[in-house]
Regions:
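Conserved Radical SAM active-site core
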Residues: 1-141, 145-151, 161
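Surface-exposed cleft-lining segments at the edges of enzyme active sites
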Residues: 91-92, 149-157, 177, 182-186
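Anion (oxyanion) recognition and catalysis
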Residues: 110, 172-173, 203
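Active-site glycine- and acidic-residue-rich loops that bind
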Residues: 117-119, 123, 185-196
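Flexible glycine/acidic-rich beta-alpha junction loops that bind and position SAM and/or redox cofactors
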Residues: 152-155, 186-190, 197, 205-209
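Charged helix-capping and loop-helix junction motifs
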Residues: 99-103, 159-162, 190-199
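Glycine-rich S-adenosyl-L-methionine
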Residues: 158-170
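Conserved strand-turn element in the central/C-terminal portion of the radical SAM core barrel
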Residues: 167-192
């Protein structure tokens, strides 16, 4: 169910030369954002600054541009690179189930010896475990702003906290590395207890902001 239903007239298809953008972020490599805008509409989202570059005047979270690009013909071009999917949108926002643009880019990158990082708040990422497991280096990076789902629902329209934690467990059990970012908020005090108790050598990392 889409919690933040965007009006059909505010969803548009846009053609782009490439979905691969050379990143200026400290992580380097490439950024991939299959959408402009994000229906999760997080009140604290830093990505709303993107409106300056897209000409959108609508409030963040009330529009969605669906990107279409020329398919990647040589995935090996990105060998040795870090590719971050979802730096200024959530590639697994609810409309991904309809448009499948994130799954499409994962298909096009098959065979690349690249480090893939997925940034998401959605359990829809579980749909693509079959593709994610084919990459040698892949991490799913989650953010959790609270363990109180009533508070969470007031802050964003993403998956519930329970759904996120269950999805994190499934991603981990599938052998995929994951990170969990948390905001500095008293209601997050027990996040380390809630996450699976695993040895220090585990592929789960929790960090605070």
């Amino acid at each position: 169910m889409i919690k933040n239903l965007i009006k059909e007239e505010d969803i548009r298809d846009v053609d782009v030369k490439s979905v691969m953008t050379k990143s200026t972020l400290p992580v380097g490599g490439y950024s991939v954002n299959p959408y402009v805008g994000c229906p999760h509409a997080c009140k604290y989202c830093y990505a709303s600054f993107m409106k300056r570059f897209t000409g959108h005047t609508e409030p963040w979270g009330t529009f969605l541009d669906v990107k279409h690009w020329k398919p990647i013909s040589n995935p090996h071009k990105y060998d040795g690179q870090r590719i971050v999917i979802g730096s200024v949108t959530d590639g697994y926002n609810p409309y991904e189930e309809r448009f499948g643009r994130t799954r499409e880019i994962l298909k096009e990158l098959q065979g690349a010896d690249a480090e893939i990082m997925i940034c998401t708040k959605s359990d829809l990422v579980l749909r693509d475990l079959d593709l994610l497991k084919t990459f040698k280096k892949v991490t799913v990076s989650w953010s959790v702003n609270t363990l109180d789902d009533n508070f969470r629902a007031d802050m964003d329209c993403a998956s519930s906290i329970v759904a996120r934690l269950k999805a994190m467990k499934e991603v981990y059990e599938a052998g995929i590395s994951l990170t969990c970012g948390r905001a500095s908020h008293p209601r997050l005090a027990r996040i380390h207890i809630t996450l699976p108790q695993v040895p220090p050598t585990s592929s789960i990392k929790v960090f605070s902001t």
